[in-house]
């Protein structure tokens, strides 16, 4: 068997998430269906580095899969790309070692979250940015977001009832930019891993700080108390993008560890 690694992007609007599940359209199911056609009708299982939720998008999701024989990687990419549905794009395919695992090999993820703060909202962005109709002071959020950087126990920012025992993660970079021409806030988080709904909960909390309904110090309070009830609401999934995944063997990996 030959193992392949692929970078994919997708519009999550019409998907019930990445991971295969019964009676739902998922990214995994669509790619596996296409690979089956390219593999003489034989099943191919793909593995994903991130299990994005319903409505969540990706520019830089990474998958891996095995095929019984070596293929020209560009022909394989082209075949997959042209036969997958229009809301999935196969960006790159490369052959990798048999022990490569897209989820368990050491890597760094970057997520982006888009928030439309226009009043009225932009209907063209309804599937691609979460609308926040209340006034915000961007400088308050930019100050508060600094407290998320570093190694912390993020229990207070994960979904209640999660089965993951170790909730310590490291965020290397966290920032907020404002694209005035589109009334868009762009939240960017880079870290060694993220808990279930962590990014959406951090954004929901920061928006509440920006609106003046929580103090700037609330991030520190939540991290210390490890209490989800102290955080803001979970922001909707339509604004979330898995932007990039960088593995340890890639040249730019060390830039984030400094």
From Swiss-Prot:
The GO annotation for biological process reads: tRNA pseudouridine synthesis
Entry's EC annotation: 5.4.99.12
What keywords would UniProt list here? Isomerase, tRNA processing
Whether tRNA processing counts among this entry's keywords is yes
Annotated substrate binding lies at 111
Please write the reaction equations for the catalytic activity of this protein.
uridine(38/39/40) in tRNA = pseudouridine(38/39/40) in tRNA
Q: Which InterPro entries match?
A: PsdUridine_synth_cat_dom_sf, PsdUridine_synth_TruA, PsdUridine_synth_TruA_a/b_dom, PsdUridine_synth_TruA_C, TruA/RsuA/RluB/E/F_N
Q: Which Pfam families match?
A: PseudoU_synth_1
List the CDD domains.
PseudoU_synth_EcTruA
In the record, the note on similarity to other proteins reads: Belongs to the tRNA pseudouridine synthase TruA family.
- Its biological purpose: Formation of pseudouridine at positions 38, 39 and 40 in the anticodon stem and loop of transfer RNAs.
Q: Which PANTHER family match?
A: PSEUDOURIDYLATE SYNTHASE (PTHR11142), TRNA PSEUDOURIDINE SYNTHASE-LIKE 1 (PTHR11142:SF0)
The record describes its quaternary structure and partners as: Homodimer.
Protein name per UniProt:
tRNA pseudouridine synthase A
């Amino acid at each position: 068997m030959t193992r392949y690694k692929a970078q994919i992007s997708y519009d999550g609007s019409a998907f019930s998430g990445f991971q295969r599940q019964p009676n739902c359209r998922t990214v995994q199911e669509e790619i596996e269906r296409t690979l089956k056609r390219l593999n003489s009708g034989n099943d191919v299982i793909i593995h994903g580095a991130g299990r994005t939720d319903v409505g969540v998008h990706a520019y830089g999701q990474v998958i891996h899969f095995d095929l019984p024989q070596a293929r020209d990687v560009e022909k394989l990419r082209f075949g997959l790309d042209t036969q997958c549905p229009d809301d999935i794009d196969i960006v790159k395919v490369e052959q990798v070692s048999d022990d490569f695992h897209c989820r368990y090999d050491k890597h760094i993820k970057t997520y982006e979250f888009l928030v439309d703060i226009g009043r009225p909202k932009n209907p063209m962005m309804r599937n691609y940015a979460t609308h926040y109709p209340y006034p915000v002071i961007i400088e308050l959020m930019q100050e508060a977001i600094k407290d998320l950087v570093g190694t912390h126990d993020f229990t207070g920012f994960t979904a209640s009832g999660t089965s993951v025992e170790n909730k310590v993660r490291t965020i290397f970079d966290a920032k907020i930019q404002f694209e005035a021409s589109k009334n868009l806030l762009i939240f960017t988080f880079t870290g060694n891993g993220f808990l279930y709904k962590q990014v959406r909960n951090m954004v929901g909390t920061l928006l509440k700080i920006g609106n003046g309904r929580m103090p700037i110090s609330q991030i520190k309070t939540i991290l210390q108390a490890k209490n989800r009830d102290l955080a803001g609401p979970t922001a909707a999934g339509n604004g979330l993008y898995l932007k990039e995944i960088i593995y340890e063997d890639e040249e730019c990996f060390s830039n984030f560890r400094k």
